[in-house]
A protein has these predicted regions:
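Cleavable N-terminal export/targeting peptides
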Residues: 1-58, 308-311
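Transmembrane beta-barrel domains of Gram-negative outer membranes and organellar outer membranes
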Residues: 44-311
C-alpha cells in the first residue's frame, strides 16, 4: 500500500547556524537602538547642563557688570542723549568709551587693581539758544586697589580705594574745565541679599594746575550710588548710572539726578555681551549753568570674564 506524503513531511526546520545568525542580528539591532537612545539622552542632558551653566554665568555677570569693585574686564560703549536742558533750548549728547582693566596681584604690587579710563565725545550747549559745539571732553581715570581684609567677605562686603585723575584734553572750553585734577576715590559693594546688589562709587578730583588763565578752580565730589536686581535668564533692572555732583566751592553747580533701567546679559558667538537702556531725570539742581533735564542712556558692554592682566 502506497504511503501518501503530507505537506508537513516536506517542511524543513532551520538549522542551528540560521538561528544563531537571526539572534545575532536582533542583538545588534537592539544594541544600536540602545546606543542611539543613550546618545540622545546624553546630548539632551549636555545641552541642559550647558544652558544651565550659561544662565548661571549670565546671572552672575548681570551683578558684576555694575559693580565698581568687581575684577571683570569690560569694554563699555555708551550713548547719552538729552533732548531737554535747563537754561538752554539745545539738545545735547555724549558718546563714551570706557574700558575696565583689572590687574591681578603682582610681585612688586601685591594687591588687585581696577583701572577705568573714560573718553567722551560731547555735544554741549553754548548758551540759552539752540547752538551747540561738539568735541572731545576731558579724559577721566580712576585707579582702585582692592581691600585685603578677608573678614569683610563674611559680611558680603567688598571695597576698594584709590585715586581719580582728570586730564585737560577737551578740544573746546565748553567741554572741559581747563585744569589738571587729582583726588581720592573709593568704592563699596554689598551682595548679602539674594539677587540684589547695592553699592556706590565716590570720586573727588581737585584742580592743581590750569591750561588757561580764566579756568575756574575745581573741587567736586562725584557720588554714584546704585543697585541692581537679577530677574533671571540674564535679565536685570538697575539704578546705577546717575552721578550726583556736589561742588564744595560756593556758587558752583550741585546736581542730584535719579535713573532707572533694564539690561540683559547674553552670549553671541561665544562672546558675553551686556545691553541696557535707562532713563534719567534731574531730581534736584542748584546751578546757573546748562544742566540736563532728562536723559536717555544706551549701553553696549563687551565682557571678558576670563581675561585679567597678570594672570
Amino acid at each position: 500500500m502506497r504511503q501518501v506524503s503530507t505537506p508537513a513531511a516536506h517542511q524543513r526546520r532551520p538549522g542551528a547556524a540560521g538561528i544563531a545568525r537571526c539572534r545575532l542580528g536582533i542583538l545588534l539591532v537592539s544594541v544600536l537602538l540602545a546606543a542611539l537612545v543613550q546618545t540622545g539622552r546624553a546630548a539632551a542632558m549636555s545641552s541642559r547642563l550647558n544652558d544651565a551653566q550659561t544662565e548661571l554665568e549670565e546671572d552672575t555677570l548681570s551683578e558684576e557688570v555694575n559693580d565698581p569693585t568687581a575684577m571683570l574686564t569690560q569694554l563699555r560703549l555708551f550713548e547719552f542723549y538729552t533732548p531737554e536742558n535747563f537754561r538752554s533750548q539745545a539738545q545735547t549728547n555724549v558718546a563714551l568709551v570706557q574700558p575696565i582693566i583689572p590687574i591681578a596681584r603682582l610681585s612688586l604690587l601685591p594687591v588687585e587693581q581696577i583701572i577705568r579710563p573714560t573718553v567722551k565725545l560731547s555735544t554741549t550747549a553754548t548758551g540759552p539758544g539752540a547752538h551747540t559745539v561738539t568735541g572731545m571732553s576731558d579724559i577721566q581715570l580712576y585707579d582702585l586697589f582692592q581691600s585685603q581684609w578677608p573678614h569683610l567677605e563674611r559680611w558680603n562686603l567688598r571695597w576698594a580705594i584709590g585715586t581719580t585723575f582728570v586730564f585737560p584734553t577737551a578740544t573746546d572750553r565748553k567741554n572741559g574745565a581747563g585744569a589738571w585734577q587729582i583726588g581720592p576715590a573709593a568704592a563699596l559693594a554689598f551682595a548679602g541679599v539674594p539677587n540684589l546688589w547695592v553699592g556706590l562709587l565716590v570720586q573727588n578730583p581737585i584742580s592743581f594746575a590750569y591750561t588757561r588763565s580764566d579756568a575756574i578752580p575745581q573741587n567736586t565730589m562725584l557720588f554714584q550710588p546704585g543697585f541692581s536686581y537679577r530677574l533671571g535668564h540674564g535679565w536685570y533692572v538697575k539704578s546705577t548710572d546717575s552721578v550726583w555732583t556736589i561742588n564744595w566751592r560756593h556758587g558752583t553747580p550741585t546736581t542730584i539726578p535719579v535713573s532707572f533701567g533694564v539690561g540683559k546679559i547674553s552670549q553671541l558667538e561665544g562672546q558675553m555681551v551686556d545691553t541696557w537702556v535707562s532713563g534719567e531725570r534731574m531730581a534736584y539742581e542748584q546751578s546757573t549753568a546748562v544742566t540736563p533735564m532728562w536723559t536717555v542712556r544706551f549701553g553696549l558692554n563687551f565682557i571678558f570674564p576670563e581675561f585679567v592682566l597678570g594672570r
